[in-house]
Amino acid sequence: MSEPRGDLQFEIMKNLGVIGEGTKGWSKEVNVVRWNNRRAKLDIRDWNETHEKMGRGVTLSADEACAFKELIGGLDLALELSV
């Protein structure tokens, strides 16, 4: 899916999964996305059902995604997030 949005173009290359559901039909998704025909990046953000509208999110390069995975891989998230 390649969609122009103003000056912004995006293509969801692969949906890796949904990590949360909103109350208005939006879902927080982890996707591999190409922005403006550039190299694909890992993307975490809210999307509406048709992927025509999006919320603010986080986009990570391959190096950043690997560093993030390493950072949280050893955490006990239940303990860390209970603070």
Regions found by a protein language model. Name each.
Residues 1-83:
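Positively charged, low-complexity terminal tracts
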